[in-house]
């Protein structure tokens, strides 16, 4: 009020509270990026990288389900690509130190497309069959979304550790189906 603004002023810049939350949630990606940078190394096979990316992603998303659901599955998640590109223009150091594959994943805001670069490398290395890759990616994204929504709906009744373990049993099953 002292600055001459009130809560209605926010709606000159954002469609509603959920869009404002989307913008403010980007900051949570910094912690995820730092942890990812510490876990990934360029000597990893693509399948190891993919597993590590998801271990870090699941850890952060299950700990902050409201934030990650808003970012990747919320009402305005379609705006995330524009927001992320702008964010990395302003804060390029946040992506420094990531491998090329993880950089391409981080820049890709559409959760359904973000795994494509690492999946292509997995196909090249023989870890996944090309014709099965799109189904594996889609299944993993949908299962993650489902688990995230379960946490949002039943936070008090759910053990996050147990939820993570169940998710990774399915994840490992999908990746090791042909091996």
Language-model-detected regions and their locations in the chain:
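Helix-turn-helix
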Residues: 1-19, 23
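Gram-positive cell-envelope targeting signals
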Residues: 5-12, 80, 87, 98, ...
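Hydrophobic alpha-helical connector segments
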Residues: 23, 38-74
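Short, basic, alpha-helical segments at the C-terminal edge of helix-turn-helix-like DNA-binding modules
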Residues: 26-33
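Short alpha-helix boundary/capping elements
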Residues: 62-65, 76-80, 141-148
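Short, hydrophobic secondary-structure boundary micro-motifs
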Residues: 69-71, 80, 131, 156
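Amphipathic alpha-helical packing segments from all-alpha helical-bundle domains
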Residues: 78-124
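C-terminal peripheral helix-coil segments that are non-catalytic and often amphipathic
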Residues: 109-125, 129, 133-179
């Amino acid at each position: 009020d002292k600055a001459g603004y009130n809560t209605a002023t926010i709606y000159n810049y954002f469609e509603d509270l959920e869009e404002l939350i989307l913008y403010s949630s980007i900051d949570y990606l910094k912690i995820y990026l730092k942890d990812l940078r510490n876990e990934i190394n360029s000597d990893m096979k693509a399948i190891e990288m993919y597993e590590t990316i998801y271990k870090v992603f699941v850890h952060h998303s299950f700990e902050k389900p409201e934030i990650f659901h808003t970012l990747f599955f919320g009402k305005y998640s379609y705006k995330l690509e524009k927001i992320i590109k702008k964010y990395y223009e302003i804060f390029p150091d946040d992506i420094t130190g990531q491998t090329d594959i993880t950089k391409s994943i981080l820049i890709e805001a559409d959760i359904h497309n973000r795994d494509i670069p690492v999946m292509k490398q997995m196909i090249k290395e023989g870890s996944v069959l090309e014709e099965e890759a799109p189904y594996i990616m889609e299944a993993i994204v949908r299962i993650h979304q489902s688990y995230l929504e379960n946490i949002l709906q039943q936070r008090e009744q759910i053990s996050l550790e147990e939820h993570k373990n169940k998710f990774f049993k399915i994840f490992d099953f999908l990746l090791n189906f042909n091996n």
